[in-house]
From Swiss-Prot:
Further facts: 2 of the reaction center chlorophylls (ChlD1 and ChlD2) are entirely coordinated by water.
Site (Cleavage): 344-345
Prosequence residues removed at maturation: 345-353
Biological classification of the source: Eukaryota, Viridiplantae, Streptophyta, Embryophyta, Marchantiophyta
Class in the EC hierarchy, top level: oxidoreductase
Protein's UniProt name: Photosystem II protein D1
Binding locations of chlorophyll a PD1: 198
């Protein structure tokens, strides 16, 4: 008896939609995470472009002193930004329908909240989509794990830090100069340069760049030549070939002699795990540092740690940084405060009378 097996056609529109969403044959994989990622990222991108070009000034400090951020209001690509939502709004959810008018929503910086919340949803779904595609193809899940580092960093500066500080106005502005302003004020208020988690992040980013350049140059310099001297060595490579494209033994030997034997990897898996893990772990730590400093667990304070036998302070570099921090702190939000928060935290002297 012969049984003929035919591919079962999905009877419903929903079934065909499910097949299309989860198909790995599409030019760009959609996936269930993509169903949420696409509209959220499109919304964030569209509103960002419109607001960067045409948004009116925003009362970021809640003191009726609007700050201009868009191109049509006098900025250029370097100085322009999406200004964070007003301190008058704080952490309140502020969609358009919560404002009395669109003009009020724009004046209070509503676009910033809209962009940031859609963006964070979108990049989280992008990470989930990476895992989903890996799962469909039978791959291991580490691509999504690596991408979790920049997702954690973005979540820290756009969501965790504003929550800790009590207002979206403390979030990072969406622009070049605004990012620098955020970094300077963050240093002034939290001494991030003296935080060990930030130091680990610097080692991760710079070390990752160094290791990436070293690896790429070693591989490119030790290609297995399949061509004549008159042709490029690149022409001998076929995409998907089973044979190795470079000689890891030669690269290992070169690097081992350049520095010392055990500074070089002779195992390709160990090498590539290290290349991935170093920057990812560093950025994880930085995101964790931002998230703790959000709640004012700040960098180390070594101010006035060294004194002479008479009790006079001998300045160290920590004191120089502290002086710079005070200068930056008194200059930012200059009309919102009459004195820096460091002085405001000191208890006022008792007055008798």
């Amino acid at each position: 008896m012969t049984a003929t097996l035919e591919r079962r056609e999905s009877a419903s529109i929903w079934g065909r939609f499910c097949d299309w969403v989860t198909s790995t044959e599409n030019r760009l994989y959609i996936g269930w995470f993509g169903v949420l990622m696409i509209p959220t990222l499109l919304t964030a991108t569209s509103v960002f472009i419109i607001a960067f070009i045409a948004a009116p000034p925003v009362d970021i400090d809640g003191i009726r002193e609007p700050v201009s951020g868009s191109l049509l209001y006098g900025n250029n690509i370097i100085s322009g930004a999406i200004i964070p939502t007003s301190a008058a709004i704080g952490l309140h959810f502020y969609p358009i329908w919560e404002a009395a008018s669109v003009d009020e929503w724009l004046y209070n910086g509503g676009p910033y909240e809209l962009i940031v919340l859609h963006f964070l949803l979108g990049v989280a779904c992008y990470m989930g989509r990476e895992w989903e595609l890996s799962y469909r193809l039978g791959m291991r899940p580490w691509i999504a794990v690596a991408y979790s580092a920049p997702v954690a960093a973005a979540t820290a500066v756009f969501l965790i830090y504003p929550i800790g500080q009590g207002s979206f106005s403390d979030g990072m502005p969406l622009g070049i100069s605004g990012t620098f302003n955020f970094m300077i004020v963050f240093q002034a208020e939290h001494n991030i340069l003296m935080h060990p988690f930030h130091m680990l992040g610097v080692a991760g980013v710079f070390g990752g760049s160094l290791f990436s350049a070293m690896h790429g140059s070693l591989v490119t310099s030790s290609l297995i030549r399949e061509t004549t001297e008159n042709e490029s060595a690149n022409a001998g490579y076929k995409f998907g070939q089973e044979e190795e494209t470079y000689n890891i033994v030669a690269a290992h030997g070169y690097f081992g002699r350049l520095i010392f034997q055990y500074a070089s990897f002779n195992n390709s898996r160990s090498l590539h795990f290290f290349l991935a893990a170093w920057p990812v772990v560093g950025i994880w730590f930085t995101a964790l540092g931002i998230s703790t400093m959000a709640f004012n667990l700040n960098g180390f304070n070594f101010n006035q740690s060294v004194v002479d036998s008479q009790g006079r302070v001998i300045n160290t570099w920590a004191d120089i940084i502290n002086r710079a921090n005070l200068g930056m702190e008194v200059m930012h939000e200059r009309n919102a405060h009459n004195f820096p928060l460091d002085l405001a935290a000191v208890e006022a002297p008792a007055v008798n009378g």
